[in-house]
């Protein structure tokens, strides 16, 4: 019966891995959305080897251990195959090495199946085995190396083959403790007399690891030691002592060992240094967030962006490509190993095998929680490996040896379970391990679902850059559908093109090095296709391609013909120009100078950041200038005079909205005051333009609009909501009278030149707008020059306004 159950479970595991291998093969075609690609075939070698090895082990278990637990090996086989394919997909060279180690582990496993199920040799030679393990670990202090050439020297190596003695030392420690305690407990010895010899040997092992700077493994040793003692004695104080010791080790490591200090800092404050010391954990969380619920698909994610993805961060790699569903299945598989392992302990025929089975289960459970918790920022990074999955021959071999001993213990045939007067410690341990795995699953859901959107929109998320090369980004169009910003190239080589670069301070940029700004940032959800597309389209695109759907085009209110004219006249001058539909709030011109060419941002980006002229700032909405005499038309409308007291000046500011920040689809600056005096208020040209609109539209200041519609695939062009709201600044009669008062020589529009003194230079304002009796679209223009040049400001404003009035 056990053989049938084990065989059926292995078939399910094989089907899952077969599907994963097939998807990895087709991934290049899916990503490129064409069949003319180079497919991935090499991972089929890994799958074939896994099938052969697994089938052979299955037959051997059925032959030598017919009564063994039928769930343990299928769980381990699934995890090892999953890890092998993940490693091979990330790096075929390391994948081939892992496949070789899988073969070696299986060979050792099959050979070990013929060991006596009593495991008396472990009891008999406990001191020799532990001493041998300690000696090998001690040799790393003299002859230790690191396969990558730097970092802690925890391996012994020769001829390109490396072995980490501290991995099997965990098993040897558990075997020693189980054998020693099983031998001494029946003697009824005093607690201290019972355990003090174990303290010496276990302490030597822990000190060796501390000298090696391997605090992750040292922490496991402390936890293993205390838990086995707790199981043997039932005294809860051992757990308290264990927690205290772990805290002490952590504190010592924090202040003495650089790498431990860095890891704890990265754990506590990862967002303070996301590109430095916390780079690993931040990229791990980004990978988990990128996986979402269903994952990007095997071969379709970007887990290689996470450092050491084949080993320390293999959980994050799996999470990105199989999502929350995949990681929950993985965590559940580890949970199955824990449950069946503790069942083996409770049903063991003698105390030694009971303690040994519980210790092995604890070792697998704690190491699993450490690595998964580190990937999820539940715990600091430790550098230990995920059993059965992570790259590493020593770890894989040790995991299979642990599995072997569990199977030997469960194959007790007709032997009755040994008496267990106090089962509570075992039940408490099992509950804690399962709760730990459950907490990890909840944390996984937190980062993948709850925080996923926030993480993926971070500018330091390199996956956005990769996606931009494969998914066409939507265009920014002017009101006549002339492209302002577009995307060229083919899938895999898409590049953002700025067709009208002078608008760069407004449209911003979408750059792999410098991130996003302007409309490219604020409209990113539409341009990336994550908003405006049906939910089913987004979900299907993620499921099938592992990416967003095609981006959507956004139509702006700008008129490129008028915009070009404004930019030509502003050439060589610093300042801003805004031409506004006074009724609807639609911005027809938004010019900011000096400007830059975002097509060459990679070459000039570093210079732009240092440029004293600040070309990156959109002066029309982010530039703040002193008001000076610019408020005279508004004072005339509200109070009927232009000579104001300080309180009257404040009332004008309040009435026309100078004290509030305009709401627009780009980042706008809030007004500021350099001193408590009202005359020192600094406002943006956009604020002045909105106030001016009230004089041309019966006292109503409109809500500004820049992005007016988006082209959706289902209903076509859809009008975008207006971010702000309009308000009545003054009565219509007051506004009309003020406009007439500022109309010169019976012209068709009102106008005013204002001046103010800035921090570094004079500022010139020019305001103009149509009158109330204008039969067409009411318009206003605002020109701001960072120089004392009223004639130029008037010329620019009049040219734009009259050109718009008589197109």
Residue map of PLM features:
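Membrane-helix boundary/helix-loop-helix interface segments in multi-pass membrane proteins
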Residues: 2-213, 372-387, 391, 395-396, ...
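Hydrophobic alpha-helical transmembrane segments
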Residues: 46-54, 103-104, 320-339, 629, ...
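Membrane-interfacial entry segments at the cytosolic side of transmembrane helices
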Residues: 121-127, 191-196, 233-244, 418-431
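Periplasmic/cell-envelope proteins involved in peptidoglycan metabolism and beta-lactam response
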Residues: 124, 410-615, 619-624, 634, ...
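Hydrophobic, glycine- and aromatic-enriched re-entrant/interface helices and adjoining loop segments
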Residues: 138, 147-162, 230, 238-330, ...
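Hydrophobic alpha-helical segments of polytopic membrane proteins
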Residues: 192-210, 215-255
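Loop-to-helix entry and N-terminal half of a specific, functionally important transmembrane alpha helix
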Residues: 344-383, 389
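Beta-lactam-recognizing serine transpeptidase/beta-lactamase-like catalytic domain environment
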Residues: 541, 583-789
């Amino acid at each position: 019966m056990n053989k049938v159950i084990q065989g059926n479970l292995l078939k399910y595991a094989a089907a899952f891995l077969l599907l994963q291998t097939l998807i990895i093969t087709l991934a290049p075609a899916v990503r490129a959305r064409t069949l003319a690609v180079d497919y991935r075939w090499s991972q089929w070698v890994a799958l074939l080897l896994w099938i052969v090895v697994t089938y052979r082990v299955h037959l051997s278990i059925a032959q030598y251990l017919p009564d063994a637990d039928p769930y343990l090996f299928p769980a381990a086989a699934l995890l090892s195959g999953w890890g092998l394919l993940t490693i091979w997909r990330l790096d075929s060279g390391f994948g081939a090495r892992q496949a070789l180690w899988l073969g070696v582990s299986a060979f050792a496993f099959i050979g070990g199946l013929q060991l006596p199920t009593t495991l008396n040799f472990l009891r008999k030679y406990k001191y020799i085995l532990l001493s041998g393990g300690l000696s090998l670990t001690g040799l790393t202090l003299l002859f230790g190396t690191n396969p990558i050439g730097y970092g802690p020297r925890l391996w012994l190596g020769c001829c390109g083959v490396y072995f980490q003695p501290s991995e099997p030392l965990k098993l040897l420690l558990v075997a020693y403790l189980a054998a020693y305690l099983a031998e001494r407990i029946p003697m009824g010895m005093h607690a201290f007399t019972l355990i003090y010899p174990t303290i010496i040997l276990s302490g030597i092992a822990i000190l060796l690891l501390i000298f090696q700077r391997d605090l992750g493994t040292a922490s496991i040793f402390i936890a293993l030691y205390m838990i086995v003692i707790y199981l043997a004695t039932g005294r809860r104080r051992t757990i308290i002592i264990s927690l205290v010791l772990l805290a002490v080790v952590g504190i010592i490591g924090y202040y003495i060992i650089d790498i431990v200090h860095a890891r704890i800092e990265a754990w506590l404050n990862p967002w303070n240094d996301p590109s430095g010391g916390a780079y690993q954990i931040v990229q791990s969380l980004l990978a988990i967030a990128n996986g979402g619920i269903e994952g990007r698909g095997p071969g379709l994610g970007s887990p290689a962006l996470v450092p050491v993805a084949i080993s320390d961060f293999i959980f994050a790699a799996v999470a990105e490509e199989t999502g929350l569903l995949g990681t929950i299945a993985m965590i559940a598989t580890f949970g199955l190993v824990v449950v069946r392992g503790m069942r083996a302990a409770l049903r063991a025929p003698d105390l030694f095998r009971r303690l040994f089975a519980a210790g092995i289960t604890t070792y697998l459970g704690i190491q699993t929680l450490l690595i998964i918790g580190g990937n999820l920022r539940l715990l600091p990074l430790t550098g230990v490996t995920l059993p059965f999955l992570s790259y590493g021959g020593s770890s894989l071999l040790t995991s299979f040896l642990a599995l072997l001993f569990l199977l030997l213990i469960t194959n007790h045939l007709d032997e009755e379970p040994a008496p267990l007067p106090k089962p509570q410690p075992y039940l408490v341990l099992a509950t804690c391990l399962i709760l730990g795995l459950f907490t990890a699953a909840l944390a996984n859901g937190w980062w993948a679902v709850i925080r996923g959107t926030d993480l993926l929109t971070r500018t330091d998320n390199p996956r956005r850059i990769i996606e931009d090369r494969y998914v066409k980004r939507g265009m920014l169009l002017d009101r006549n559908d002339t492209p302002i910003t577009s995307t060229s190239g083919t899938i895999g080589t898409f590049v953002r093109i700025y067709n009208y670069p002078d608008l760069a301070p407004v449209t911003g940029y979408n750059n792999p090095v410098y991130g996003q700004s302007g409309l490219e940032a604020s409209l990113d959800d539409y341009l990336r296709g994550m908003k405006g597309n049906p939910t089913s389209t987004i979900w299907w695109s993620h499921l099938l391609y592992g990416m967003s759907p095609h981006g959507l085009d956004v139509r702006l209110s700008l008129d490129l013909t008028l915009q070009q004219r404004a930019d030509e006249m502003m050439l060589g001058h610093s300042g801003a120009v805004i031409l506004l539909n006074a009724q609807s709030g639609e911005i027809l011109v938004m010019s900011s100078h000096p400007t830059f060419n975002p097509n060459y941002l990679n070459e000039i980006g570093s210079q732009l950041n240092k440029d004293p002229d600040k070309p990156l700032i959109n002066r029309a909405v982010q530039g703040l200038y002193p008001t000076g005499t610019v408020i005279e038309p508004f004072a005339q409308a509200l109070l009927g005079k232009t000579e104001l007291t300080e309180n009257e000046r404040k009332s004008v500011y309040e009435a026309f909205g100078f004290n509030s920040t305009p709401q627009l689809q780009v980042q706008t600056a809030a007004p500021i005051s350099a001193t408590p005096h009202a005359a020192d208020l600094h406002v943006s040209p956009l604020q002045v333009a909105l106030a001016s609109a009230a004089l041309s539209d019966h006292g109503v200041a409109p809500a500004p609009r820049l992005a007016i519609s988006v082209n959706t695939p289902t209903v076509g062009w859809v009008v975008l909501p207006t971010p702000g709201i309009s308000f009545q600044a003054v009565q219509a009669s007051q506004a009309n009278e003020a406009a007439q008062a500022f109309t010169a020589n019976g012209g068709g529009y009102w106008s005013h030149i204002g001046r103010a003194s800035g921090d570094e230079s004079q500022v010139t304002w020019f305001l103009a707008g149509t009158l109330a009796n204008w039969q067409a679209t009411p318009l206003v223009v605002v020109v701001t020059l960072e120089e004392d040049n009223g004639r130029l400001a008037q010329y620019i404003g009049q040219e734009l306004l009259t050109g718009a009035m008589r197109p």
